[in-house]
Amino acid sequence: MRIIVVDNYEEMSKKAAAMMASQVILKPDSVLGLATGDTPIGMYREIINIYKNQKMDFSKVKTFNLDEYYGLNRGNPQSYYYYMMNNLFNYVNIDKNNINIPNGMADNIEVECKEYERKIDKAGGIDLQILGIGVNGHIGFNEPNISFESETHLVNLNEKTIESNSRFFSSKEEVPTKAISMGIKSIIHSKKIILLACGSAKSDAVSKAINGKITPNIPASILQLHRDVVVIIDKEAASKLNLK
Protein backbone atom coordinates (compact mmCIF):
# COMPACT_ATOMS: atom_id res chain seq x y z
CA MET A 1 0.00 0.00 0.00
CA ARG A 2 1.39 3.38 -1.04
CA ILE A 3 0.16 6.43 0.86
CA ILE A 4 0.36 9.90 -0.66
CA VAL A 5 -0.49 12.79 1.65
CA VAL A 6 -1.29 16.06 -0.12
CA ASP A 7 -2.09 19.57 1.05
CA ASN A 8 -5.65 19.90 -0.16
CA TYR A 9 -8.59 18.58 -2.15
CA GLU A 10 -7.40 20.13 -5.41
CA GLU A 11 -4.02 18.41 -5.21
CA MET A 12 -5.68 15.09 -4.34
CA SER A 13 -7.97 15.45 -7.36
CA LYS A 14 -5.09 16.25 -9.73
CA LYS A 15 -2.96 13.31 -8.58
CA ALA A 16 -5.85 10.88 -8.90
CA ALA A 17 -6.75 12.22 -12.35
CA ALA A 18 -3.14 11.90 -13.50
CA MET A 19 -3.09 8.25 -12.44
CA MET A 20 -6.36 7.52 -14.19
CA ALA A 21 -5.14 9.30 -17.32
CA SER A 22 -1.94 7.24 -17.31
CA GLN A 23 -3.99 4.05 -17.05
CA VAL A 24 -6.12 4.96 -20.07
CA ILE A 25 -3.21 6.28 -22.15
CA LEU A 26 -1.15 3.13 -21.55
CA LYS A 27 -4.14 0.80 -22.02
CA PRO A 28 -6.78 2.47 -24.22
CA ASP A 29 -9.29 -0.34 -23.62
CA SER A 30 -9.00 -0.09 -19.83
CA VAL A 31 -11.84 -1.22 -17.59
CA LEU A 32 -12.40 1.44 -14.94
CA GLY A 33 -14.30 1.05 -11.68
CA LEU A 34 -15.79 4.39 -10.72
CA ALA A 35 -17.08 5.99 -7.53
CA THR A 36 -19.53 8.80 -6.79
CA GLY A 37 -20.15 11.30 -4.00
CA ASP A 38 -18.31 14.52 -3.16
CA THR A 39 -14.79 13.11 -3.12
CA PRO A 40 -14.22 12.20 -6.80
CA ILE A 41 -15.95 15.23 -8.36
CA GLY A 42 -12.69 17.19 -8.55
CA MET A 43 -10.93 14.21 -10.12
CA TYR A 44 -13.59 13.94 -12.81
CA ARG A 45 -13.28 17.67 -13.47
CA GLU A 46 -9.52 17.25 -13.97
CA ILE A 47 -10.09 14.24 -16.24
CA ILE A 48 -12.37 16.34 -18.44
CA ASN A 49 -9.64 18.99 -18.69
CA ILE A 50 -7.07 16.38 -19.69
CA TYR A 51 -9.50 15.02 -22.28
CA LYS A 52 -10.16 18.49 -23.70
CA ASN A 53 -6.41 18.90 -24.18
CA GLN A 54 -6.58 15.82 -26.41
CA LYS A 55 -4.49 13.67 -24.13
CA MET A 56 -7.12 11.01 -23.42
CA ASP A 57 -9.38 8.87 -25.57
CA PHE A 58 -12.34 7.12 -23.93
CA SER A 59 -13.67 5.47 -27.08
CA LYS A 60 -12.53 1.97 -26.03
CA VAL A 61 -12.83 2.39 -22.26
CA LYS A 62 -15.39 0.38 -20.31
CA THR A 63 -16.66 1.56 -16.93
CA PHE A 64 -18.39 -0.10 -13.99
CA ASN A 65 -19.80 2.00 -11.19
CA LEU A 66 -19.59 0.76 -7.64
CA ASP A 67 -23.20 1.28 -6.71
CA GLU A 68 -26.63 2.79 -7.24
CA TYR A 69 -29.52 3.65 -4.96
CA TYR A 70 -32.35 1.12 -5.06
CA GLY A 71 -35.63 2.70 -6.10
CA LEU A 72 -34.26 5.75 -7.94
CA ASN A 73 -34.76 5.90 -11.70
CA ARG A 74 -31.94 7.12 -13.91
CA GLY A 75 -33.56 10.49 -14.48
CA ASN A 76 -33.58 11.27 -10.77
CA PRO A 77 -30.95 13.96 -10.03
CA GLN A 78 -29.84 11.97 -6.95
CA SER A 79 -29.24 8.76 -8.89
CA TYR A 80 -25.63 7.84 -9.54
CA TYR A 81 -26.43 7.36 -13.22
CA TYR A 82 -27.43 11.04 -13.35
CA TYR A 83 -24.31 11.96 -11.36
CA MET A 84 -21.96 10.15 -13.73
CA MET A 85 -23.55 11.55 -16.86
CA ASN A 86 -23.35 15.11 -15.53
CA ASN A 87 -19.91 14.89 -13.93
CA LEU A 88 -18.02 12.89 -16.57
CA PHE A 89 -19.68 10.91 -19.32
CA ASN A 90 -21.41 13.79 -21.11
CA TYR A 91 -18.05 15.50 -21.55
CA VAL A 92 -15.87 12.71 -22.98
CA ASN A 93 -16.09 10.43 -26.00
CA ILE A 94 -17.06 7.27 -24.15
CA ASP A 95 -19.28 4.78 -25.98
CA LYS A 96 -22.54 4.79 -24.01
CA ASN A 97 -22.74 1.01 -24.54
CA ASN A 98 -19.56 0.69 -22.47
CA ILE A 99 -21.07 2.43 -19.42
CA ASN A 100 -22.24 0.05 -16.71
CA ILE A 101 -24.15 1.25 -13.64
CA PRO A 102 -26.43 -0.98 -11.55
CA ASN A 103 -30.11 -0.54 -12.38
CA GLY A 104 -31.79 0.74 -9.23
CA MET A 105 -35.22 0.03 -10.74
CA ALA A 106 -34.53 -3.59 -11.69
CA ASP A 107 -37.53 -5.90 -11.26
CA ASN A 108 -35.36 -8.82 -10.22
CA ILE A 109 -32.48 -7.67 -8.01
CA GLU A 110 -30.85 -11.10 -7.78
CA VAL A 111 -30.69 -11.36 -11.58
CA GLU A 112 -29.43 -7.76 -11.85
CA CYS A 113 -26.60 -8.43 -9.39
CA LYS A 114 -25.51 -11.68 -11.03
CA GLU A 115 -25.61 -10.07 -14.46
CA TYR A 116 -23.44 -7.19 -13.22
CA GLU A 117 -20.81 -9.65 -12.00
CA ARG A 118 -21.00 -11.51 -15.32
CA LYS A 119 -20.38 -8.28 -17.24
CA ILE A 120 -17.33 -7.47 -15.12
CA ASP A 121 -15.93 -10.96 -15.73
CA LYS A 122 -16.66 -10.74 -19.46
CA ALA A 123 -14.80 -7.41 -19.62
CA GLY A 124 -11.74 -9.09 -18.14
CA GLY A 125 -12.05 -7.62 -14.66
CA ILE A 126 -11.41 -4.08 -13.48
CA ASP A 127 -8.01 -2.59 -14.28
CA LEU A 128 -8.30 0.45 -12.02
CA GLN A 129 -10.86 0.91 -9.26
CA ILE A 130 -11.51 4.33 -7.71
CA LEU A 131 -12.80 4.27 -4.14
CA GLY A 132 -13.92 6.75 -1.54
CA ILE A 133 -14.37 5.79 2.09
CA GLY A 134 -17.36 6.37 4.33
CA VAL A 135 -17.12 7.75 7.86
CA ASN A 136 -17.88 4.22 9.08
CA GLY A 137 -15.19 2.67 6.88
CA HIS A 138 -17.47 1.50 4.10
CA ILE A 139 -16.31 1.20 0.50
CA GLY A 140 -18.95 1.20 -2.17
CA PHE A 141 -22.07 0.70 -0.09
CA ASN A 142 -20.53 -2.23 1.77
CA GLU A 143 -21.51 -1.42 5.33
CA PRO A 144 -19.70 -2.64 8.49
CA ASN A 145 -19.80 -6.39 9.10
CA ILE A 146 -20.27 -7.21 5.43
CA SER A 147 -18.75 -10.51 4.33
CA PHE A 148 -15.40 -10.16 2.61
CA GLU A 149 -16.69 -12.82 0.18
CA SER A 150 -19.61 -10.66 -0.98
CA GLU A 151 -20.21 -9.93 -4.65
CA THR A 152 -22.68 -7.45 -6.16
CA HIS A 153 -25.73 -7.43 -3.87
CA LEU A 154 -28.61 -5.44 -2.39
CA VAL A 155 -27.54 -3.53 0.74
CA ASN A 156 -29.53 -2.11 3.64
CA LEU A 157 -27.89 1.25 4.31
CA ASN A 158 -27.11 1.92 7.95
CA GLU A 159 -28.04 5.02 9.89
CA LYS A 160 -24.61 6.66 9.62
CA THR A 161 -24.61 6.35 5.84
CA ILE A 162 -28.16 7.66 5.51
CA GLU A 163 -27.32 10.58 7.81
CA SER A 164 -24.14 11.37 5.86
CA ASN A 165 -25.87 11.22 2.48
CA SER A 166 -28.85 13.28 3.59
CA ARG A 167 -26.89 16.42 2.63
CA PHE A 168 -27.58 15.57 -1.01
CA PHE A 169 -31.34 15.36 -0.45
CA SER A 170 -34.01 17.81 0.71
CA SER A 171 -34.47 15.79 3.89
CA LYS A 172 -33.16 12.67 5.58
CA GLU A 173 -36.48 10.95 4.88
CA GLU A 174 -35.84 11.19 1.13
CA VAL A 175 -32.61 9.19 1.29
CA PRO A 176 -33.12 5.65 -0.04
CA THR A 177 -32.60 2.98 2.60
CA LYS A 178 -31.25 0.40 0.15
CA ALA A 179 -28.69 0.30 -2.64
CA ILE A 180 -27.12 -2.13 -5.10
CA SER A 181 -23.37 -2.34 -4.52
CA MET A 182 -20.41 -4.24 -5.85
CA GLY A 183 -19.23 -6.50 -3.05
CA ILE A 184 -15.90 -6.62 -1.26
CA LYS A 185 -14.81 -9.63 -3.31
CA SER A 186 -15.72 -7.78 -6.51
CA ILE A 187 -13.67 -4.75 -5.45
CA ILE A 188 -10.63 -6.62 -4.17
CA HIS A 189 -10.27 -8.47 -7.48
CA SER A 190 -9.46 -5.16 -9.22
CA LYS A 191 -5.89 -5.08 -10.53
CA LYS A 192 -5.15 -1.64 -9.07
CA ILE A 193 -7.06 0.48 -6.54
CA ILE A 194 -6.93 4.19 -5.72
CA LEU A 195 -8.55 5.21 -2.43
CA LEU A 196 -9.38 8.90 -1.99
CA ALA A 197 -10.23 10.74 1.22
CA CYS A 198 -10.35 14.39 2.19
CA GLY A 199 -11.22 16.22 5.39
CA SER A 200 -11.04 15.57 9.13
CA ALA A 201 -14.40 13.76 9.12
CA LYS A 202 -12.68 10.85 7.33
CA SER A 203 -9.62 10.71 9.61
CA ASP A 204 -10.96 8.00 11.95
CA ALA A 205 -12.05 5.76 9.09
CA VAL A 206 -8.74 6.24 7.26
CA SER A 207 -6.72 5.44 10.38
CA LYS A 208 -8.71 2.30 11.16
CA ALA A 209 -8.62 1.13 7.54
CA ILE A 210 -4.85 1.53 7.20
CA ASN A 211 -3.44 1.10 10.72
CA GLY A 212 -6.14 -1.03 12.33
CA LYS A 213 -6.76 -4.75 12.21
CA ILE A 214 -8.37 -6.28 9.15
CA THR A 215 -12.01 -6.74 10.09
CA PRO A 216 -15.41 -6.74 8.37
CA ASN A 217 -16.37 -4.06 10.90
CA ILE A 218 -14.17 -1.69 8.84
CA PRO A 219 -14.76 -2.90 5.27
CA ALA A 220 -11.95 -0.74 3.85
CA SER A 221 -9.41 -2.57 6.05
CA ILE A 222 -9.42 -5.43 3.53
CA LEU A 223 -7.40 -3.16 1.24
CA GLN A 224 -4.36 -3.90 3.42
CA LEU A 225 -4.23 -7.29 1.69
CA HIS A 226 -4.36 -5.96 -1.87
CA ARG A 227 -1.06 -5.92 -3.76
CA ASP A 228 -1.52 -2.58 -5.55
CA VAL A 229 -3.33 0.12 -3.59
CA VAL A 230 -2.55 3.84 -3.69
CA VAL A 231 -4.14 5.98 -0.97
CA ILE A 232 -4.33 9.70 -1.81
CA ILE A 233 -5.46 11.78 1.15
CA ASP A 234 -5.15 15.34 2.38
CA LYS A 235 -3.45 16.29 5.64
CA GLU A 236 -6.71 16.42 7.57
CA ALA A 237 -7.77 12.93 6.52
CA ALA A 238 -4.26 11.71 7.38
CA SER A 239 -4.17 13.44 10.78
CA LYS A 240 -4.70 10.25 12.82
CA LEU A 241 -2.52 7.97 10.71
CA ASN A 242 0.65 6.36 11.99
CA LEU A 243 2.92 6.72 8.96
CA LYS A 244 6.08 5.29 10.56
UniProtKB/Swiss-Prot annotation:
Which pathway does it operate in? Amino-sugar metabolism; N-acetylneuraminate degradation; D-fructose 6-phosphate from N-acetylneuraminate: step 5/5
Identify the keywords attached in UniProt to this record, alphabetized: Carbohydrate metabolism, Hydrolase
Tagged with keyword Hydrolase: yes
Q: Which reaction does it catalyse?
A: alpha-D-glucosamine 6-phosphate + H2O = beta-D-fructose 6-phosphate + NH4(+)
Reply yes or no: does the keyword Hydrolase apply.
yes
- Pfam families tied to this protein: Glucosamine_iso
One term under GO cellular component: cytoplasm
Q: Which HAMAP family match?
A: GlcN6P_deamin
Instruction: Write out the function statement from the record.
Output: Catalyzes the reversible isomerization-deamination of glucosamine 6-phosphate (GlcN6P) to form fructose 6-phosphate (Fru6P) and ammonium ion.
Which NCBIfam families does the record match to this protein? nagB (TIGR00502), PRK00443.1-4 (NF001684)
The protein, known as: Glucosamine-6-phosphate deaminase
